[in-house]
Amino acid sequence: MVAAPSARRLVRRSHSALLAALTVLLLQTLVGWNFSSLHSGAGERRGGAAAGCTEQPAPPPAPAPRRERRDLPPGPAAPLGACCGGGGRGPPARARARALAGCPEEPRPQQPAGQGALPTRALDGYFSHRPKEKVRTDSNNENSVPKDFENVDNSNFAPRTQKQKHQPELAKKPPSRQKELLKRRLEQEEKGKGQSFPGKGTHEALPPGGRAAVNGSHGKDAPRQPHTRKSGGGSPELRYDQPPKCDISGKEAISALSRAKSKHCRQEIGDTYCRHKLGMLMPKKVTRFCSLEGKANKNVQWDEDSVEYMLANPVRIAFVLVVHGRASRQLQRMFKAIYHKDHFYYIHVDKRSNYLHRQVLQFARQYGNVRVTPWRMATIWGGASLLSTYLQSMRDLLEMTDWPWDFFINLSAADYPIRTNDQLVAFLSRYRDMNFLKSHGRDNARFIRKQGLDRLFLECDAHMWRLGDRRIPEGIAVDGGSDWFLLNRKFVEYVTFSTDDLVTKMKQFYSYTLLPAESFFHTVLENSPHCDTMVDNNLRITNWNRKLGCKCQYKHIVDWCGCSPNDFKPQDFHRFQQTARPTFFARKFEAVVNQEIIGQLDYYLYGNYPAGTPGLRSYWENVYDEPDGIHSLSDVALTLYHSFARLGLRRAESSLHVETGNSCRYYPMGHPASVHLYFLADRFQGFLIKHHATNLAVSKLETLETWVMPKKVFKIASPPSDFGRLQFSEVRVGTDWDAKERLFRNFGGLLGPMDEPVGMQKWGKGPNVTVTVIWVDPVNIIAATYDILIESTAEFTHYKPPLNLPLRPGVWTVKILHHWVPVAETKFLVAPLTFSNRQPIKPEEVLKLHNGPLRSAYMEQSFQSLNPVLSLPISPAQVEQARRNAGSTGATLEHWLDSLVGGTWTAMDICATGPTACPVMQTCTHTAWSSFSPDPKSELGAVKPDGRLR
């Protein structure tokens, strides 16, 4: 009887204590809700997501501490994290309370999926994903490595790891500690994998035969396979035709072996490493044949009037064009500008560029002084194959006894002349005994270190593998700079046919060198009997912008960090008119980036085309051609090209309909025949799809071309906010972001469920501000949200949120908010696939690809609590429709795809490439937009009386 009142009092006290504890927790949450800021993606000063040359392929950084509440009542700005600026206004109190209730500090149990909501992950809160730190680079004259190379760690040799999940223990550690912890964790994972292959940072030696030692009875009982071993982490099985002849102990060689894909390449890596280790690969001493002390540097003068004093015996030039890609019309325009009947043109097309090779063969047949190499190499950036291409081209040219040339000039399709042929011939005739190469312009020891000349490289599997260190041979001076040069015939003969100690050993040394063409000819010339003929000028202007061009963009094909020139723009035109030093060519030019500058230069040299000439502001570039085969297309591209063709047929039926019946109705047949990008006035206008279709009126096959253009999807908030830096600018989403030219190389933004989209924002000038970016999927699931600091000088920012795949097909939205007030938004399409591995998709594949990520969780944390704040309700009907769509196949799937494509693309026009039964269908050659329409600026015709084409 006495115990009962005591128990009741205890319960009341416990209840009061519990309420007090909950109140304290609520207050702590109010104070502690901290949304982490995110550094600018690719701003002018703070720069992009991970250009940093020093970084490894790594998991996304761990979340930083949560940021402070943005949605406080109006008042003094709350201080934000180091990357954020300003506090601000927020949604109403009721919305704030809901948002707060949905984002507790600790993870909460997963809510069961109810009607109108999709199941989401339990961790409900906001975490930012910081991009990697940026390494700043500077101009270093003419060669392709960063100037501040002492600060660049090129040990980017670890096998790629899977994207890491949220790791709370890293959240409050500084970035350096996070990296250390992640590195230790990766090392522990590698050690824990059975028979795992050593990765980056390990010095474990492989015994001869390539088999790793194993512990315990497993090693004794396991069946042995000679010259075979498994690598960890899903790496390819390591096989050798012959066992390596030494212990492979260098970390670079071990890493190269773990990443090489083919058995042949791994064999070559092992053999090369062992030959070098045994002292059988590199020359130790080389003979110098130059009698001069130091470096010769002849001064040459440019005289604008020299063309008037043409010599009686003008030089004849062998132009060697080393080209790749698909920009055939730009190549033809450049060829047209440099052509003269007195010169010779030898064209090498990359082994992987079959479309361009077909186009080059076609126009080369028209001219007797144009030939195409009967052999082809894959000339990767920085690869030894480029030097091999030049040396073989030189040998071929010297063996062509009917081509009496005097100078060797190498060009690419991205070059363009900036002075006339007559001026070039007059200048070279005056200095016919000289060789023109651009040197690096700094001390050799520093150049050797920055250029990686003291490192051993091997090219195989279309990759340059770094295998270790080496010594520079004694007895010679090493030089280098630009790999664009003009060499006279005497020196070319010496390099090609000489068997002396210098040439023989330098060819061996540079066969295992990164960017060998940037140094081989310089070094041989400076140490040869021809050393007094060197002119430190390659007669070119190269558009170096180290801040943009040194993004380590070639790390996927070379174990080093390099730079690339930027494309010229109209504002650069004045640079071509300088006369301080002799220059005759400039690079780089890209018509898909800017064609106006090419037109300006062309008109400056050769005058304007006649008034009314068609196609001068248009540019077409092929991205698919039927002989390439559909295996050359991705499933996303093949899916959308088919949908674009059907969109064109529907336009023909609706807009070209005539009373006579079905004469303008078609049924699609087969795969697309070709696809072109179409630009007008340097603006992307969409795709041109050439495709086959059966005319239903006559049951005959016709070939048509459809023009589809993306609809405008970027819009400023209405009513406009007081935030003005996005006005007249843009927000875009895509893949293949080019940080150098600051555009998406995936023109049109064709995306599928397994793509990893990047968000890009272009800014106007203004004060430093912080904006919030929110990604919303087709059923209003908030997939990601993060802050970006836009500095006053920033023009672009970009970031790729680490979303779990697959993405849900449909129309996505990216919103930009300032102080949680909408500023702008854009939309992008994630297309459902109708093809998988270039075959019609199977029913068992559609649900895996079209139903979104597991439990609809795009990231570790959920942002479901922000839906009411942002007025983004999740509709049960919309969710159910998405579920049904995800299981669609056949005609139902095509109908779903076409409805999505029709909402984001417009069929602008359609034409017939040949005979047609549709009486109102226009012929493609009579349109201004078709890839079959006239293009005089790139068309090659008969040689004119003055010997030129232009």
Curated annotation (Swiss-Prot):
GO biological process, alphabetically ordered: chondroitin sulfate proteoglycan biosynthetic process; embryonic skeletal system development; heparan sulfate proteoglycan biosynthetic process; ossification involved in bone maturation; proteoglycan biosynthetic process
Name recorded for this polypeptide: Xylosyltransferase 1
Domain of life from the UniProt record: Eukaryota
Positions that bind UDP-alpha-D-xylose: V322, D350, T379, I380, W381, D483, W484, S564, R587, K588
Gene name for this UniProt entry: XYLT1
Pathway it works in: Glycan metabolism; chondroitin sulfate biosynthesis; Glycan metabolism; heparan sulfate biosynthesis
Main location: Golgi
Presence of the UniProt keyword Transmembrane in the record: yes
Family membership noted in the UniProt record: Belongs to the glycosyltransferase 14 family. XylT subfamily.
Residue stretches spanning the membrane: 18-38
Keyword Chloroplast attributed: no
Keywords from the UniProt entry: Disulfide bond, Glycoprotein, Glycosyltransferase, Golgi apparatus, Membrane, Metal-binding, Signal-anchor, Transferase, Transmembrane, Transmembrane helix
Biased composition (Polar residues): 152-161
Biased segments, Basic and acidic residues type: 134-150, 166-193
Cytoplasmic membrane side: 1-17
Residues the record marks as carrying a glycan: N215, N410, N768
Intrachain disulfide bonds: C246-C274, C290-C531, C550-C563, C552-C561, C664-C918, C911-C924
GO molecular function, one term: metal ion binding
